[in-house]
Amino acid sequence: MLKSNNASETAAHKVGDKTAKKVFFRRRKGCPLSVSNAPVIDYKNPELLIKFVSEGGRMLPSRITNVCAKKQRKLNNAIKIARILALLPFVFQAK
C-alpha cells in the first residue's frame, strides 16, 4: 500500500513540475574591483571611494555595488579613514 501511495505522489510531482513556472535567475557580474586593471583601494583616493557612498553619505552595501566581501571590508575601512582625515565628509549636504 505504501508503494502505491509513493507512486501516485511522484506522478503528481511530475505533473506539477510541468505546470510550475520557471524561475529566472540573473547571473551576477563579477566584482568590479577584482579585475586585472582595477584601481587600488586606498583612503587617499576619494574619487574612487565616493562611488561607493550614497547621496546621504552612507556606505552602499555590496548587494548594490556587486563588490566581493573582501573588497567591501577594505572599502569600508578606507572610507572610515578618509572621513577621519577629512578627505570625505561624514554627511553630504543636500543641494
Swiss-Prot record:
SUPFAM superfamilies: Ribosomal protein S18. InterPro entries: Ribosomal_bS18, Ribosomal_bS18_CS, Ribosomal_bS18_sf. Keywords: Ribonucleoprotein, Ribosomal protein, RNA-binding, rRNA-binding. Gene3D superfamilies: Ribosomal protein S18. Pfam families: Ribosomal_S18 (PF01084). One of its GO terms (cellular component) is cytosolic small ribosomal subunit. GO terms for biological process: translation. It comes from the Bacteria. GO terms for molecular function: small ribosomal subunit rRNA binding; structural constituent of ribosome. The keyword rRNA-binding applies. Disulfide bonds: none annotated. PANTHER family: 30S RIBOSOMAL PROTEIN S18, SMALL RIBOSOMAL SUBUNIT PROTEIN BS18M. Binds as a heterodimer with protein bS6 to the central domain of the 16S rRNA, where it helps stabilize the platform of the 30S subunit. Belongs to the bacterial ribosomal protein bS18 family. Part of the 30S ribosomal subunit. Forms a tight heterodimer with protein bS6. NCBIfam families: S18. This is Small ribosomal subunit protein bS18. The gene is rpsR.
